[in-house]
Amino acid sequence: MVLSGKDLAAHRKEEILFQGLSFCLFPHQLMTITGPNGIGKSTLLRIIVGLFEAAEGHVSLKDHEQTYPVATACHYLGPQNAMKPFLSVIDNLQFWSAFYGQYLRSPHEALADMGLSDLAPLPFNVLSTGQKRCVAIARLLLSYRPIWILDEPISGLDSHAQTLLANLFQRHLNQGGMIIAATHSPFGIPENHKIALEKFVPSQERRE
């Protein structure tokens, strides 16, 4: 399985966010996307997933010469946690488990992996920012998807949670998974590719 992007570009109204961006990702590999706020990291992730259309270029996922939509093989974690605020933590995860349909771990097992078993009966909206993010990450464990595409996954996490997440990422990579993550901070595990998005901003836009 190979996930690649070729000569990608994105525009925001008349502004060119980035252009000429290419990458190629294989199993067991982590690619991080860095850059200041507003430069287009989230836009790039959404283009890769297929939520946005690139202004130029294309993204492809190939396995044994067959091409597949990226969305069919990925978990996407955006800046929002995609949880219903007044449902309990466990009810939220049970909803996602039923939605995915292909079980890898039960909601209780996913929470245990994240060290969050005690939070299961609590309404999602009473959790701290970091706890909410960890519950959202637990969603990735419910059903196996080889590609994880993550937007600032460690935002709001304390050092203990960041270490736990780094171990989780490494386990996914060791199992043949791929991860693409926008981040301001390193995860503490080896990065195979690092895209500094400011390098793909046209020089005129950069000066402005």
Swiss-Prot record:
Q: What is its EC number?
A: 7.6.2.5
Give an example GO biological process: cytochrome complex assembly
The reaction(s) catalysed by this protein are: heme b(in) + ATP + H2O = heme b(out) + ADP + phosphate + H(+)
Gene Ontology MF terms in the entry: ABC-type heme transporter activity; ATP binding; ATP hydrolysis activity
Question: Per its UniProt record, what InterPro entries does this chain match?
Answer: AAA+_ATPase (IPR003593), ABC_transporter-like_ATP-bd (IPR003439), ABC_transptr_haem_export_CcmA (IPR005895), P-loop_NTPase (IPR027417)
| Residues annotated as binding ATP | G35, P36, N37, G38, I39, G40, K41, S42
- Using the record's annotation, list all stretches that form the ABC transporter domain: 3-206
- Where does the protein principally reside? membrane
> What top-tier enzyme class does this entry carry?
translocase
Hey, what's the signal peptide range on this chain?
Answer: none
Q: Give the matching PROSITE patterns.
A: ABC_TRANSPORTER_2, CCMA
For this UniProt record, give its keywords in alphabetical order, as a comma-separated list.
ATP-binding, Cell inner membrane, Cell membrane, Cytochrome c-type biogenesis, Membrane, Nucleotide-binding, Translocase, Transport
The cross-references to Pfam families, in alphabetical order and at most eight, read:
ABC_tran (PF00005)
Q: Tell me the protein family, please.
A: Belongs to the ABC transporter superfamily. CcmA exporter (TC 3.A.1.107) family.
Protein purpose = Part of the ABC transporter complex CcmAB involved in the biogenesis of c-type cytochromes; once thought to export heme, this seems not to be the case, but its exact role is uncertain. Responsible for energy coupling to the transport system.
List, alphabetically, the PANTHER family matched: ABC TRANSPORTER I FAMILY MEMBER 1 (PTHR43499:SF1)
UniProt xrefs under NCBIfam families: ccmA
User: Which protein, by its recorded name, is this?
Assistant: Cytochrome c biogenesis ATP-binding export protein CcmA
